[in-house]
């Protein structure tokens, strides 16, 4: 039971780190788009 909880927590933290990475990537892309639009 405790091991299962640990596995769930590990999975959740891994998912969270992946989501954070994706959000960072999307944020940098949208900033590049904003700059590109602003420069035109």
Swiss-Prot record:
The name this protein goes by in its record: Cytolysin EnT
Cellular component GO terms held in the UniProt record: extracellular region; nematocyst; other organism cell membrane; pore complex
Subunit structure of this chain's protein: Octamer or nonamer in membranes. Monomer in the soluble state.
Residue span of region N-terminal region: 11-30
KW Secreted (keyword) present: yes
InterPro entries with a match to the protein in the record: Anemon_actinoporin-like, Cytolysin/lectin
Function: Pore-forming protein that forms cations-selective hydrophilic pores of around 1 nm and causes cytolysis. Pore formation is a multi-step process that involves specific recognition of membrane sphingomyelin (but neither cholesterol nor phosphatidylcholine) using aromatic rich region and adjacent phosphocholine (POC) binding site, firm binding to the membrane (mainly driven by hydrophobic interactions) accompanied by the transfer of the N-terminal region to the lipid-water interface and finally pore formation after oligomerization of monomers. This toxin shows hemolytic activities.
């Amino acid at each position: 039971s405790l091991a299962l909880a640990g596995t769930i927590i590990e999975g959740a933290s891994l998912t969270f780190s992946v989501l954070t990475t994706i959000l960072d990537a999307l944020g940098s892309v949208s900033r590049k788009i904003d700059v590109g639009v602003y420069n035109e």
